[in-house]
Amino acid sequence: MHTVKLLCVVFSCLCAVAWASSNRQPCHSPPLTSGTMKVVSTGGHDLASGEFSYDSKANKFRFVEDTAHANKTSHMDVLVHFEEGVLYEIDSKNESCKKETLQFRKHLMEIPPDATHESEIYMGSPSITEQGLRVRVWNGKLPELHAHYSLSTTSCGCLPVSGSYYGDKKDLLFSFFGVETEVDDPQVFVPPAYCEAVAFEEAPDDHSFFDLFHD
């Protein structure tokens, strides 16, 4: 009888832990983050690698591709103001700019509010000092894009670790390295003066952050 009672108590506790985990609310990114972001296709093709900066309060994102990356004739430099729904493609060498509308504003720098907490796991070793990292795994759907995603963040601090996007058009894998909770130059979120007079180009309603990365 005591054994049965003990098993019931243990089972109840495990259920409570599982319920609490599945109902965990999405964490929020620090006000400012920066570091290196690499994007590859699930087929193993390198799509982009460079420095990112993110302002979570203003929901602004800048990504400047490493000019040494691959054998490309042009390299990505994009600024996205998600709240305003504006995407800038910047060519600082020629001082030219392309400005597009962005109707779909979800992205993997911020966990969507309707994301589901999947699990909390250790990467590496939990028992050896400085040899492990505890991360939380979140996932969800993007029905407007006929896609779904998964995003891993640090348990303490909500820093991005990795992400994946699976859609009808493409599958993408994101990795983040050397992430800091600061941005050296806040001006990276301000479009260059030569972008001001550029007219908007209307983009489809399903045009998204994920369309930036392609073969």
UniProtKB/Swiss-Prot annotation:
PROSITE patterns per the UniProt record, alphabetical: EPENDYMIN_1 (PS00898), EPENDYMIN_2 (PS00899)
Family matches, as SMART domains: EPEND
A Pfam family hit: Ependymin
Tissues with expression: EPDs are synthesized in the meninx and secreted in the cerebrospinal fluid.
Keywords from the UniProt entry: Calcium, Disulfide bond, Glycoprotein, Secreted, Signal
GO biological process, one term: cell-matrix adhesion
GO cellular component terms listed in the entry, alphabetical order: extracellular region; lysosome
Signal peptide: 1-20
Predominant localisation class: secreted
Positions of glycan attachment: 71, 94
Assembly and oligomerization: Forms disulfide-linked dimers.
Name used for this protein in its record: Ependymin
Species of provenance: Cyprinus carpio
The gene coding this protein: epd
